[in-house]
């Protein structure tokens, strides 16, 4: 029987290609945002007439420079809006709509689709079993104009997930565990297929975190094999009926098993995503700012976890919390999570990538220590190159904000 990766490529090419084959693939969806969209549209202009193969299959979101923090950013947005209008693109999310990857996940992505984005973290949509792959501006422009582009077929790698999350452990810790085991770029040339033994214990929001950080692992894609959680998510979020496939074991290049019960809260210490330590090893490090959000950890379960820990407390360091989309913000507000966070002293705003890329709304200064739920911690990622960046899950982030130093969240979750 074919693997899920082979199944997807068979649907697109009419054959099961071998790893390393170069194939042409027609995407089901193409996405870009303000930071990359300018370059994508410039390439289209150089190719002649600015046109897209199917305006219903294009998603555009303003998230990186949103709202525009300077004149140049405002000029870029004016330029993109003009093209969005002239092309008649209906799936456009202006300032306040949210982060592109979250929007695609909650509104559009379906199991078995092929999705290309002009951003490396488009693989977030792998949470629902889509082959989601980031590309540069030139390749995205070609895909938009021609309705197809080339891919090197990756080798399938199977990850089995067993057990259930202990208190204080989340999807971020699965991602950090894999990074610690295989290293940054350890999955180069692979399409990672994740099978969850007990689907209900691994929520969709946590799956999205793992898919998102597969970029840091070097994976071409990471897909959770569709199951009951996938079907429930699609029904609840969009009213779509979906029946998960019954897959027989396929032939994989390699396999690995994650035992959730053996994990504990993990932290990626400066200055590499694979410099992974347990929270106990870095506990007590004083922190200047905490960021809870991003396309990695700005979903409802992330915000709810932070609110649970911070309820009735005041933060002892700067704390910025950003839900990843308007839908997440709206739901978090209805459930009271936004009130809890603001009363705790957090600065809360709508979906923007600002702090994650060191662009605005919380840039790191020289010598500062930042703990963030985002996905990268190399020098200069969140601002000044002399800043130190730690990556962790939202529970660790909230506990750290409560204490002003890196803290184990488990004592906060005992009752």
Swiss-Prot record:
Cofactor(s) in the UniProt record: [4Fe-4S] cluster
Ligand binding ([4Fe-4S] cluster): 295, 353, 356
Pathway in which this enzyme or protein is active: Amino-acid biosynthesis; L-leucine biosynthesis; L-leucine from 3-methyl-2-oxobutanoate: step 2/4
Its EC number(s): 4.2.1.33
Pfam families linked to this entry: Aconitase
Function in brief: Catalyzes the isomerization between 2-isopropylmalate and 3-isopropylmalate, via the formation of 2-isopropylmaleate.
Stated name of the protein: 3-isopropylmalate dehydratase large subunit
Naturally occurring in which organism (per UniProt): Pyrobaculum arsenaticum (strain DSM 13514 / JCM 11321 / PZ6)
């Amino acid at each position: 029987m074919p693997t899920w990766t082979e199944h997807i490529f068979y649907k697109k090419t009419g054959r099961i290609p071998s790893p390393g084959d170069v194939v042409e693939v027609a995407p089901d969806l193409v996405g870009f945002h303000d930071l990359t969209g300018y370059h994508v549209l410039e390439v289209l202009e150089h190719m002649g007439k600015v046109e897209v193969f199917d305006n219903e299959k294009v998603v555009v979101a303003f998230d990186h420079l949103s709202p525009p923090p300077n004149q140049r950013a405002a000029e870029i947005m004016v330029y993109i809006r003009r093209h969005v209008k002239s092309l008649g693109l209906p799936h456009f999310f202006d300032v306040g709509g949210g982060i592109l990857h979250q929007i695609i996940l909650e509104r559009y992505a379906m199991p078995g689709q092929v999705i290309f984005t002009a951003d490396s973290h488009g693989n977030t949509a792998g949470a629902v079993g889509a082959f989601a792959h980031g590309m540069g501006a030139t390749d995205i422009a070609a895909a938009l104009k021609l309705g197809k582009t080339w891919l090197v077929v990756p080798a399938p790698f199977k990850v089995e997930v067993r057990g259930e999350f202990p208190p204080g452990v989340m999807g971020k810790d699965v991602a950090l565990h894999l990074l610690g085991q295989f290293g940054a770029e350890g999955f180069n040339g692979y399409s990672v297929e994740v099978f969850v033994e007990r689907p209900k214990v691994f929520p969709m929001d946590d799956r999205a975190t793992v898919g998102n950080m597969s970029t840091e692992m070097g994976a071409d894609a990471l897909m959770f094999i569709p199951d009951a959680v996938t079907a429930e998510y699609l029904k609840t979020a969009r009213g779509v009926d979906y029946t998960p496939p019954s897959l027989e074991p396929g032939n994989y290049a390699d396999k690995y098993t994650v035992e959730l019960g053996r994990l504990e809260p993990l932290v990626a210490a400066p200055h590499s995503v694979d410099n992974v330590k347990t929270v106990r090893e870095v506990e007590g490090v004083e922190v200047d700012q905490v960021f809870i959000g991003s396309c990695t950890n700005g979903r409802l379960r992330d915000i709810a976890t932070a609110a649970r820990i911070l309820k009735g407390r005041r933060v002892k360091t700067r704390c910025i919390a950003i839900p990843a989309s308007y839908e997440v913000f709206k739901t978090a507000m209805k459930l009271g999570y936004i009130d809890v966070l603001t009363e705790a002293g957090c600065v809360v705003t709508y979906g923007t990538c600002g702090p994650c890329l060191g662009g605005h709304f919380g840039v790191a200064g020289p010598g500062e220590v930042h703990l963030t739920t985002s996905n990268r911690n190399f020098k200069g990622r969140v601002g000044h190159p002399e800043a130190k960046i730690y990556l962790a899950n939202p529970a660790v982030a909230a506990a750290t904000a409560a204490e002003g130093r890196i803290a184990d969240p488990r004592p906060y979750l005992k009752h």
